[in-house]
Amino acid sequence: MARKKDPAVLTLDRTLQARTVQGKLCEKLEGGRVRCVACGHRCVILDGLDGICRVRFNHGGTLHVPRGYVAGLQVDPTEKKPFFHAFPGAVALSFGMLGCDFHCGYCQNWLTSQALRDVSALSPPRDVAPEEIVAIAKRHRAPVMVSTYNEPLITSEWAVEVFALARMEGITCGYVSNGNGTPEVLEFIRPHVDLYKVDLKGFRDASYRQLGGKLDNVLRTIERLHAMGFWVEIVTLLVPGFNDSREELRDIASFVASVSRDIPWHVTAFHQDYKMLDTADTTARDLMRAADLGFEAGLRYVYAGNLPGRVGDLENTRCPQCRTLLVERFGYRILHYRLADDGRCPSCHSTIAGFWRSGWKIPEMDGGLPGRVPRSVPIPAAQILPIGGQFGEEAGVPPDRRSASRRRGIRSFRPS
């Protein structure tokens, strides 16, 4: 049965429709249909409708995709992403748009990811040019730039446009993603993206379907990412009663090890958020138990996150050969750093897996203790979009483009 969309969501929808360009990650089909290949859903979209992500739509047989705004823009420690084996102690310029192809009930970025589904989820979008984003990164001396907050795969055309300029300035770029990719989108972003964090949300297909995805597609994406030479780190948010059984965690760890024992696996603590307000928070003991399973599976780098100072040695990086402490952390803070700038252990000279840049030195802070904390980046108020303005003028799309289907609340995609 068709669901009627809340008027406030419709208003946001109209605001975003003007900020689009013709998509590249698609295939034209007969009858004015298009197949989108930006994510694993591979939506076949009829003229006048949109995909499951609700931000990529078909108008006149042409796929339109988001461009020219951000809903989140912040300077973060790289450890927050988390990337523990790339530019330790640095900051990353993080940006994101709106929308997601999943609908996780425990999403910790739901204000951006679910804005097109949930009237209570809204981060006001702000007009911004790619050049402005790169200039902000340079101003904050950020060697890393990351597309995050919403699902970056569904806004890959925009990310690539920004990253192309960033790379010209020597900035390394990355994705923080659910991993629901396709071979086409990975080939599209590969020239511009070096770092890729995947949320592996569990190891049961039934659970993945509750979230709006399929387990096998995420697993194949992880395998492709590693084979294509991306630096991959994997995060599993431990949700009590959902994905924290010993058997499931062992399966996750074994899979990651089968791809590469050098892939860092982060097990992180769930806290009550969005629609899951009755589930107990993850304990430090739960994280340490999960980490033990990772080491038992043969993984060399296993970390526990979101509970700083409560998980023993599991925030730190040690040499897997001689066990020398290389990076000591407390949350996002680096307390001690001994890794050579070429990524080698100073004691046994073993190479530590990671994305290391020759000549990289950890930023010097007062007392040698980098205490960088996330901070939002201000954008002039004039660039905050007035929700509900006339749509379509920039893209040349008439304001009544799909008003009929929207008023009826018709579901707007068909699986291929």
Where are these regions (language model features)?
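Auxiliary Fe-S-binding modules of radical SAM enzymes
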Residues: A2-D47, R246-S416
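Conserved AdoMet/S-adenosylmethionine-binding subsite of the radical SAM
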Residues: D127-D286, A290-L293
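Short recognition patches in nucleic-acid-associated and regulatory proteins
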Residues: I52-V55, G61-P66, L326-I334
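Residue-level detector of family-conserved "landmark" positions at structurally sensitive sites
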Residues: R117, S147, V176, I234-V235, ...
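Conserved Radical SAM active-site core
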Residues: N58-L195, P363-R372
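Conserved, mostly hydrophobic/aromatic
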Residues: C104, V198, V302
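Cys/His-coordinated zinc-binding microdomains
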Residues: G40, R54-F57, D101, Q108, ...
